[in-house]
Structure formats: structure tokens, C-alpha cells
Amino acid sequence: MKIVHYSDVEDVVIDKFPYKGKTNEVKGTSIRWLSKQGDDGHGYPEYGLRYFTIQPGGYIPIHNHFYHQTMYILEGRFECWCFDAASDEIKEKSIATPGHAVYIPSMEPHGMKNIGESPGAFLCCICNVYEQES
């Protein structure tokens, strides 16, 4: 067993996210890896729990990934976006506030912005998926 307090974990600023061969700017966002286990062979852990902080007006742009993720909003007000995979146009916008859980399936293009007036925070649990062998 390992017990950590989130404030004892390094807070790493994120300034870029890759998507479809391009690098997109991330604004006002930092991450703390509370736990991570395994290696999926693509540079990601098989399981992880992360603590994100996004400053007012900060955002995470369109991106996708192999792993499933569920975000649990702790503080703040977020506009969450789901994009059409072919056109990269926003196909759905939703507001998430404390107590909301946001599930993102594997490879779904998505992003979010802190639309509140104070820093927002959420837990993000990731779990990789694997292709079934035939």
C-alpha cells in the first residue's frame, strides 16, 4: 500500500498536447501523477490516477488517446467538448461542475476549458484498452 497527499506530488505544467501529427497549445494546466502502474508499450501507464489543476481561462485543446478516462470534478466550472473525429468540429458541449463525472471512451477527440473565475481541479483516472487477439 502507498498513501500520498496530492500536495506532496510534483505539480508539472503541461504546455502542449499532440493531436493528428500536430502539437496544440495547452494553457494554464498542470498535472500531478498520484499513482501509475504498468506500461502499455505506447509510453502510457496501464492505469493511472492524476490530479489536474486548470487556471481560469485555461484549457486542454482537442486530443485523443488509446486509454479510457473518467474525470471527477472537484472544483471549478468546466466546458467540456466532444469533437467529430472526421472533421474535428465540436459536436457536443457540456458544463461540468463539482460532483460531475465525465467519461471519455478510447480515441474520442475531446478537450475542455475552465470557464469559472477560480482555479478548477479534477481527478482523472485512466485505464488502457487492448485489442483482442483473434
Language-model features: locations:
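Short regulatory "switch" loops immediately downstream of catalytic or recognition motifs
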Residues: 33-37, 76-86, 92
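Short, conserved beta-strand element in jelly-roll/cupin
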Residues: 51-55, 65-80, 84, 125-127
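Short beta-strand His + acidic residue motifs that chelate non-heme Fe in jelly-roll/DSBH
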Residues: 60-62, 80-82, 104, 110-117
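Conserved short histidine dyad/triad with adjacent acidic residue
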Residues: 35-37, 48-65, 106
